[in-house]
């Protein structure tokens, strides 16, 4: 074969491939991922909560599919969002510390979409994956700059940050800049309902006296007030979400856009953010995809934050990289039968860049969630529970004073103010959703405990986890 003929065939092949790609792009959906910040699953009306005001999210769920068992890969913003972006665990991609920038060699799904013709971006509250210096530390920023560690300006077409109000403006700017012949992906991040909580946030505030407190909340006036302020911030987010949906509709983009709403991790409430309990990692997840998702559906399949990346790639016709450990939920969206997950995992790491003063800023833990039971491994069990993001609030200081005065129930005093924590915890989520009864060591659940521990050990080994494995030392027979 002559060089001329070879070059001709290569050119024809390239043109055919390009035409096929362009044809596929025309049929590919836009992707809009809207993230609330620190938002636990019970706190949306459509999840059976009759006390919170979220009409836009409730309408959105009626038009799509609600996932009842979706979990963040971490109870902290940075690791959880890193898993969303990469389809991999925070440990596997070295993103267990709150301030870590995403490693240069780790691919994100927006980059893969961009390579296939998508216009991609992030907007609103910070996407959290370019690291932070913390306390204005110039040294850390200098290191980031010298080693070119902050990479998102190069990874995406559009990178903006700010609160949700700015984010809504940035959403419109993003759509204005998008080339007409390209589909888009945008991650739009809200600051709600992240602390701090304040009065007069919602158009119609929630009455603290009328709210039903979770079973693991002490019933005090200040606890009720704090909880009501949290609900108010969710209502404000709901208003903003409605505005975003209207922009999409007004621009004629709603019918070909897969819209996903998710909480990035659990709420900064008691036993929430920063913990591996349900309030820390069990998050709302709703998807709407006209013509592909039958309206009003509910799924009880286990969904991890790692699963969004492969789901989006498959929906857009892009190959899923082998390194992604997430499992695509595309078939679930389409209503096809699936085996589904038996287990998913979450990881707790350092929450700040500086030296810790307790478990709020530095804790290490892992957990495995099964269809019914959850097993938690607290590697730093010697440290007492400390709240993340609300240690200075009036309601927490009031609880401390009540505990010292002996005014808390023995159960709540033990949960929040014991000098240490259990190394291992096992909960029956079906019968004890508030995780108040630790079943570790019980004869009737010994087989479940052993199985979940084995599953977690295997995960940690495969991920090359840096934590000691949850195996007790036996002086006679070695490890057991």
Tell where the protein language model's regions lie, with residue ranges:
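Formylglycine-dependent sulfatase
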Residues: 2-425, 433-464, 468-472, 476-480
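C-terminal helical cap and adjacent loop that interface with cofactors, partners, or active-site loops
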Residues: 430
């Amino acid at each position: 074969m002559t060089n001329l003929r070879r070059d001709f065939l290569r050119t024809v092949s390239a043109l055919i491939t390009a035409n096929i790609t362009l044809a596929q792009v025309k049929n590919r959906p836009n992707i809009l991922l809207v993230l609330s910040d620190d938002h636990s699953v019970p706190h949306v009306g459509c999840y059976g909560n009759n006390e919170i005001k979220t009409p836009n999210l409730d309408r959105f769920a009626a038009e799509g599919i609600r996932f009842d068992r979706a979990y963040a890969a971490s109870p902290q913003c940075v690791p959880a969002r890193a898993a969303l972006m990469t389809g991999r665990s925070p440990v596997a991609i070295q993103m267990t510390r709150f301030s870590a920038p995403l490693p240069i060699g780790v691919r994100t799904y927006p980059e893969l979409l961009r390579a296939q013709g998508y216009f991609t971006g992030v907007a609103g509250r910070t996407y959290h994956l370019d690291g932070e210096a913390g306390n204005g530390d110039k040294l850390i920023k200098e290191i980031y700059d010298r080693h070119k560690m902050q990479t998102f300006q190069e990874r995406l077409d559009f990178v903006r940050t700010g609160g949700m109000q700015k984010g809504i403006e940035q959403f419109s700017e993003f759509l204005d800049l998008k080339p007409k012949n390209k589909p888009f992906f945008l991650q739009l991040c809200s600051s709600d309902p992240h602390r701090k909580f304040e009065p007069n946030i919602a158009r119609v505030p929630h009455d603290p006296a009328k709210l039903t407190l979770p079973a693991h909340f002490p019933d005090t006036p200040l606890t009720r007030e704090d909880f009501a302020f949290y609900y108010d911030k969710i209502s404000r987010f709901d208003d903003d979400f409605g505005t975003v949906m209207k922009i999409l509709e007004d621009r004629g983009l709603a019918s070909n856009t897969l819209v996903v709403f998710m909480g990035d991790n659990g709420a900064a409430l008691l036993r929430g953010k920063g913990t591996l309990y349900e309030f820390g990692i069990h998050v709302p997840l709703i998807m709407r995809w006209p013509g592909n998702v039958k309206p009003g559906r509910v799924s009880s399949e286990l969904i991890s934050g790692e699963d969004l990346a492969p789901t989006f790639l498959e929906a857009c016709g892009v190959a899923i990289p082998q390194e992604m450990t997430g499992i695509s939920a595309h078939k679930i969206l389409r209503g096809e039968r699936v085996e589904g997950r038996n287990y998913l995992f979450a990881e707790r790491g350092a929450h700040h860049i500086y030296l810790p003063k307790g478990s709020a800023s530095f804790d290490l833990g892992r957990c495995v969630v099964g269809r019914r039971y959850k097993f938690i491994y607290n590697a730093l069990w010697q440290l007492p529970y400390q709240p993340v993001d609300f240690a200075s609030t009036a309601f927490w200081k009031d609880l401390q004073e009540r505990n010292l005065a002996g005014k808390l129930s023995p159960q709540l005093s033990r949960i929040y103010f014991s000098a240490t924590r259990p190394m291992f915890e096992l909960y029956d989520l079906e019968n004890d959703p508030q995780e108040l009864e630790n079943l570790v060591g019980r004869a009737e659940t010994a087989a479940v405990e052993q199985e979940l521990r084995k599953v977690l050990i295997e995960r940690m080994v495969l991920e090359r986890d840096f934590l000691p494995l949850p195996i007790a030392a036996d002086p006679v027979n070695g490890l057991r």
